[in-house]
Each structure stands twice: as C-alpha cells, then as structure tokens.
Design a protein with these regions (language model features):
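Active-site and NAD+-binding cores of ADP-ribose-processing enzymes
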Residues: 1-36, 71-218
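Extended catalytic/binding region for NAD+/ADP-ribose chemistry, centered on the ART fold
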Residues: 41-73
Length: 218
C-alpha cells in the first residue's frame, strides 16, 4: 500500500478520497456515529458527538469489522454490506501510526503502548479521542487491530452522534453486498473462512475464545 504524505501528527485525507465501511444491512448503519463504551475511539463523554469507523481500503474495512472471529457463516456475510464513501472536504486526522505520536500519549498521561491500538481496555484510547476531538481534529488514523502485518489503516471519524443521513455526512456513497473477491482476499490474507452452512450459536459467539483471532477484539 502507498503511504500518503503526512505532515507532523496530521494525516490529510483529500476531498474525494474513497473510504470504506463494512456494516450491518440496516437503516442508518452507513453514517452511524457510535457513543457507546464499546468503540475504541468513541467520544463517550462528549455531548452529541460520536465516532464512525472506516478504512482506507476494502480489505482493511473487512478485517477490522470481521477479523475477531475467523469462521463466519454465509448468512452472517449476507447480512452485511460494503459501502464506499467520499467526503466533500479534506479530513485532518491525527496519525497514531507514526512514532512522533508518543508526545500526544504523554500529554494525555498515557504510555505509548500497543494497548491503545489493540488492547481490550478502551478507557485510554477514548481519552485520546477526546483529546484529539478537542484539538479540532476530524478523527484518528490508526493501524487496523486485526491486521498482524500492520499494512491496513483504519479511520475513526468524529461527527454528530447517532444515525445520520448518508448524503449529509458523505459527498457520495455506493453500497453493495460483500463480494467474493473480498471474501477470498480475507481468507487468503487473514484466514477468515466463510462457510456455506450455519454455525452453531456457541461457535459464533463473539465472546468465545475458540473463534477469536489472535489480534483480539476490535
């Protein structure tokens, strides 16, 4: 993957850049800005502000959403969609993938450790999200948690909390089913198997260690 130019802590996503999101096939899911405690960079204590998770490429969105469980049923895949969106302005993101980001960790009283990107305790990354939001960043660029090769980049985009009209948040949006090319790439690169038959409730339990990837929970 080509690394776009980054100045200091800033990572600029130019207007019109295609971004990718894998999400449930339900109303409001494309431009959903989460406020719960269950999102790594959610703005849990900022009134009326939430976080929408995207990626710079389709496989990055696929692995970030589905990489926790390495065996999926076809029904599970069919219940999801792949959306390609673009924004009508440049996005200024804080780039957590750069070593220079350590200063930001220290200013928030945090250690520069992989737990920010991949740990199960979300308190620290949520504190960082609040810090960057208050510094007028549009969001955060980080390494996809479930990618052991650290090749794919994810985006935590800040915006109005809850479901939003897609055409208000994004300049363009195309949504389709998850194609076989993406499924094949997920299997070849990350070992995510998609089975034609249903998986038992226990096997598809996201809390079951048997079906979790080594990278953990995203």
């Amino acid at each position: 993957m080509t690394e776009p130019a980054t100045a200091g802590h800033d990572y600029i996503v130019p207007v019109g850049t295609p971004l990718h999101r894998v999400h449930r096939d339900r109303p409001g899911a494309i431009a959903w800005f989460d406020t719960s405690e269950h999102g790594r960079f959610n703005l849990t204590d900022v009134t009326d502000r939430g976080t929408c998770y995207l990626a710079l490429d389709p496989l990055g969105a696929y692995i970030e959403t589905l990489g926790r469980i390495l065996t999926r049923s076809r029904d599970d895949i069919n219940a999801r969609r792949h959306s390609t969106v673009a924004v009508d302005r440049d996005l200024r993101l804080f780039d957590l993938t750069r070593s220079e980001a350590r200063a930001a960790y220290r200013s928030a009283g945090l250690d520069h450790t992989a737990t920010i990107r991949a740990g199960d305790d979300y308190e620290a990354p949520q504190r960082l999200a609040r810090l960057f939001h208050d510094d007028d960043y549009d969001g955060i660029l980080y390494t996809a948690r479930h990618d052991p090769g650290h090749a794919h980049r994810s985006i935590a985009l800040f915006g109005r909390a809850g479901p939003n009209d897609t055409d208000v948040v994004f300049d363009s949006c195309e949504t389709d089913t998850i194609g076989n090319d993406l499924i094949d790439a997920g299997r070849a690169t990350f070992g995510i198997a998609v089975l034609a038959y249903p998986i038992s409730e226990h096997a598809n339990d996201e809390g079951s260690s048997r079906w979790r990837s080594d990278a953990g929970v995203g």
